Amino acid sequence: MKMMGWVGAAVLVAAGSCGAQRPAQGPMSDTKYTAESLGYSLFWHDEFDGDALDGSKWAIRGEGPRALGRVSREAIEVKDGYLTLKAFEKDGVVQVGMVGTQGRFMTKYGYFECRAQLQRGGGIWAAFWIQSTLIAKGEDPATFGAEIDIMEFFRKLGKDIVSHNVHWAYGPHQQTTHGMQSYLEGVSEGFHTFAVEWTPKRYTFFVDGYKFYEVHQGISRIEEYIILSMEPPQQEEISKMKLPDEYIIDYVRVYKKKGQDPKK
């Protein structure tokens, strides 16, 4: 992939972007990392090799109305080694797919990665994230956890930009790091990897192995679960949709440091 000299550079995100956004930036250096190069070993994974969602690992998340759409099992397909989260219209309502590991797999710390092909259109958006079950019960992220947005793709921000974020303390005093934007040419074409390294001191966000951001705020120190979602549109985004559309996931992998006890 061509880097086009964007190491450490910033690209201004188009007006009307999603909430408070930082300028998009290129990777922090030319170094390309893998989980293994950072000292991690595979701990949990799903390669989606079957012909149905593995119920021991995943469940449909929040089936029913969501924003101006509906989370539907009809929008979830496992076939030919891929999980596809679809977006399509049925009876005048946008149907989308969303799955999570809540109640099946929860952990803290490690290197979380997926390989995926992002959606083609706007309005809807693909996301790969981690969330605590306690996030709305208190304001201390160490105790109540956080929402860690490893990757979100809002096409209106630009076809070569993906977003990351951390939120905690759901409610009137919610805190956020504000949107971090990573620029990598061609990220909306074909398959790419999106990852976060979560430690007791920081979150580090990666795209295709390149390090883009380090965050030292909102650090969760409790177990959380993984979510893959195709998010339905908001009112102002309906006209930007091009349905049907899809978000295709090749794998999800979680790595741990060698000898690390995931319960500590």
Task: Give the residues covered by each predicted segment.
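Bacterial N-terminal signal peptides
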Residues: V7-A15
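Bacterial N-terminal signal peptides that target proteins for export
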Residues: M1-V7
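GH16 jelly-roll
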Residues: Q21-K264
